[in-house]
Amino acid sequence: QISAGLLFQKNTDHTDSDLKRLQESAEQKAIDFITFLPEMRRILSTDVTAMYNGDPAAQNKAEVILCYPAIRAICNYRIAHKLLELDVPLIPRIITEMAHSETGIDIHPGAVIGEYFAIDHGTGVVIGATSVIGNKVKLYQGVTLGARSFPLDENNNPIKGIARHPIIEDDVIIYSNATILGRITIGKGAVIGGNIWVTENVAPGERLVQAKAKP
């Protein structure tokens, strides 16, 4: 599959020497990926622990692993992210979109996500390509970590490769349907309430909630 991805990316006629180099590159990437699997398993175990500890409805970790759609999405993301780090084309996005179609959770493989990551319920969660998420972060359903705007080039096309999504520091909780846009920072230990639109930095430990309706 890695070889196929590399061939697809080249999209040109290949000489025998080209094919040999691509095959050697694919084999090395596969070896590097396999070597990383024990560490990936360790990281995924922290995600399972976070999901189990944070959900009183979870009876055991086996239930979390087998039944929770967020674990499927996070597992696919962690596989895809490592492949992307190894410069494997196309396949990482296919892997995360498979989880997206099955779970309703859209995590771009380019996002950087720390350990003990939890998504509760999960439907409608969107995590953009340049998002950075620290350790022990919990998101609820419908959360969007998105971009606020796209700088355009001289042809009015969006400029690619610019950091445009939020930075979420350690120990942050973001409740359902919160929308956080742009390259802003949500500080360590902050709590973002549900149904809130955030476009500015949030200080560490701050609690941001909707204003109470006036009588």
Tell me what each language-model feature is:
Residues 1-94:
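Terminal amphipathic alpha-helical/low-complexity segments used for targeting or macromolecular assembly
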Residues 99-215:
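Structural signal for interior beta-strand "rungs" in well-ordered beta-sheet cores
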